[in-house]
Amino acid sequence: MYEQAIVIRNDLKMGKGKMAAQACHASIQAYLHAQKISPSAVMYWMNEGQKKVVLKVNSEKELLEIFRDVNIDGLPCSLIRDAGKTQIEPGSLTAVGIGPEKEDKISKVTKNLKLL
């Protein structure tokens, strides 16, 4: 099975709408990256119903560690930096999108994270 994971910073105390927007940015950007580097994974994921899981971290440091590990493993990903026009400081790192890719490859990096 294939999935996409979105990891959101919980320490920024974004409103629900803001979190949803950041998750969407991460999802779309990771999807576009996956289309370039792993089109077959995208095809399988699309055919399987586009499973997504949204997880949380509690700091920028944790978010960057996830992003680093995902890159080391060669998974399609995105790192989202907010423009800062509404709730948070400009340039704040808010989310990481991972995949779509095989669940076991993603869970290797995200297995210790909790659901948002």
From Swiss-Prot:
Pfam families given for it?
A: PTH2
Q: What is its EC number?
A: 3.1.1.29
Write out the catalysed reaction.
an N-acyl-L-alpha-aminoacyl-tRNA + H2O = an N-acyl-L-amino acid + a tRNA + H(+)
Q: Write out the entry's keywords from A to Z.
A: Cytoplasm, Hydrolase
Q: Which InterPro entries match?
A: Pep_tRNA_hydro_II_dom_sf, Pept_tRNA_hydro_arch, PTH2
GO biological process terms, alphabetically, are: translation
Name the source's superkingdom.
Answer: Archaea
A single GO CC term, please? cytosol
Tell me where in or outside the cell this protein is found. Answer: Cytoplasm
Q: Which GO terms describe its molecular function?
A: peptidyl-tRNA hydrolase activity
CDD domains attached here?
A: PTH2
Disulphide-bridged cysteine pairs: none
NCBIfam families of this UniProt entry?
arch_pth2, PRK04322.1
| Protein purpose | The natural substrate for this enzyme may be peptidyl-tRNAs which drop off the ribosome during protein synthesis.
Q: What family does the database annotate?
A: Belongs to the PTH2 family.
Q: What is the protein's given name?
A: Peptidyl-tRNA hydrolase
List the source organism. Methanococcus vannielii (strain ATCC 35089 / DSM 1224 / JCM 13029 / OCM 148 / SB)
